[in-house]
Amino acid sequence: MKRMGDSMACENIVGVLLAGGKSRRMGGGDKCLLQLGGKTILQHAIDRATPQVGNLILNINGDPDRFSHYNLNIVSDDIGNFAGPLAGVLTGMHWVKENHPECKWIVTFPTDTPFFPMDLASKLYDAVSDNKAELACAASGGRHHPVFGIW
């Protein structure tokens, strides 16, 4: 398999920004549209994810028009009723199968954690390549972060 440093590997990965939650702990609304340092949290996530993948989509629930100015493919959960982040992962997989069947991997980035590493996708890709695994998730401080994953 090609190492992530190879541009072909990056081009064959679709990034899925996960923004489909209810934001219950923050009183509802779109967490990713909150401002942080003069940009939305979503824009911070877009800025970090874009150079790591060949294509980037935004997974949401609700009215897609509120995200239209981001110029991303916007995909609503295939499973209704705010089923959780795995519904966004599944939706991303379905979108890739339909729109980019040549891509073998998706990398998921939750939009409520915008300061993920700039080499996250490459580390995840290398983990699945080195271990001949079917998926990998991020870990730090002895804890797993499964929403940051390659699938």
Role assignments for model-derived ranges:
Residues 1-7:
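N-terminal amphipathic/basic-hydrophobic helices that include classical n-h-c signal peptides
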Residues 9-150:
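Nucleotide and nucleotide-moiety/phosphate-recognizing core
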